[in-house]
């Protein structure tokens, strides 16, 4: 994965060298004023998200149609491209980061290393979570914040109150800023609830929401602690999220004890 994205990927689910950082400098006050005045529509969010994702797709290894990862995601996600009135698209990044993210234009990107750890139902739970962020317009907030940070290098433009076209360099900076943005814990909890309801609506195993979060909790410890726990710091506690899913499943009469949840020793296909 390109250096600009390595430590920034924390908008999704629920870093290994220094990413290129954005130096806001004296532009910060202009950005603040610009953010107050900026008329940022849903169409603006979709347009800028699409441009950012296209930039990321060009700068990251995307699996091709013959890849087992692509075939697996097609099998799981293909039927949900028009979920809940949304127009969604998806791809797999063949990278060692453990994550997934969604954007305001309906783009969902899943990382191969995450797929290696999750069962089909757990991946569907994560996909449902990401769809929830799009449906709840959390991703609109993220792209607006990212745009303001990228435009900060042009203080006059940032303060003008109008969304302007960005250069290729600024698009890269916006992609970095968008992925570095963090949803609030309330937004994450709402997306968790959406994921559970998504699983229930389609007849999937809702217990997978619980087991996915249990795996996230395991990933927050041990050798992965420094990078993964930092990424998850803005999210509600994974154990608490798992327990919330369990309570919903018990209430709905859908709980089946999965036994001890562990991380797989070999990639799940």
Language-model segments: residues:
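Positively charged n-region of N-terminal signal peptides that target proteins for export
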Residues: 1-4
